[in-house]
Amino acid sequence: MRIGHGFDVHRFGGEGPLIIGGVRIAHPQGLLAHSDGDVALHAATDALLGAAALGDIGKLFPDTDPAYKGADSRALLREAYRSIRARGYRLGNLDITLIAQAPKMAPHIPQMRVFLAEDLQCPIDDVNVKATTTEKLGFTGRGEGIACAAVALLIKE
């Protein structure tokens, strides 16, 4: 078994869309990023890559490569997971923590879990998503952006 940790942060800016965990969420701004700015999937991808000792999302999908401009983070997650599967690993479980003052994530978490289970070809019970605030402290508390942490367990087959 191998454990990986991922973390990502993006600040709000532009008109959007705001995509978190593959779900489009109504919000006046999107997140500024080279790709679609999906902090949940970026943190999850980093956790998976870290567990497999394959570097990080920036190594696999460099933000200097125009091919990834505006990229769908679900596609990036699927591609990263294919590389992990090719090394003989499968997901044990994935746990994601979103950190944001707004928008409220709870209504969107069930669909995020569905997308993650689809993309990682696993039972929905192997993926968890939860959200918290920083009680209006720091950049997330001031509504300047969203942060996300993820932990993944991989099992050698």
From Swiss-Prot:
- Kindly list the GO molecular function terms attached to this UniProt entry: 2-C-methyl-D-erythritol 2,4-cyclodiphosphate synthase activity; metal ion binding
Q: Which EC numbers does the record give?
A: 4.6.1.12
Residues engaged in binding 4-CDP-2-C-methyl-D-erythritol 2-phosphate: 8-10, 34-35, 56-58, 61-65, 100-106, 132-135, 139, 142
Cofactor names from the entry are: a divalent metal cation
Any GO BP annotation? terpenoid biosynthetic process
Per UniProt, subunit arrangement is:
Homotrimer.
As for what it does, the entry says: Involved in the biosynthesis of isopentenyl diphosphate (IPP) and dimethylallyl diphosphate (DMAPP), two major building blocks of isoprenoid compounds. Catalyzes the conversion of 4-diphosphocytidyl-2-C-methyl-D-erythritol 2-phosphate (CDP-ME2P) to 2-C-methyl-D-erythritol 2,4-cyclodiphosphate (ME-CPP) with a corresponding release of cytidine 5-monophosphate (CMP).
What is this protein's record name?
2-C-methyl-D-erythritol 2,4-cyclodiphosphate synthase
Q: Which organism is it from?
A: Edwardsiella ictaluri (strain 93-146)
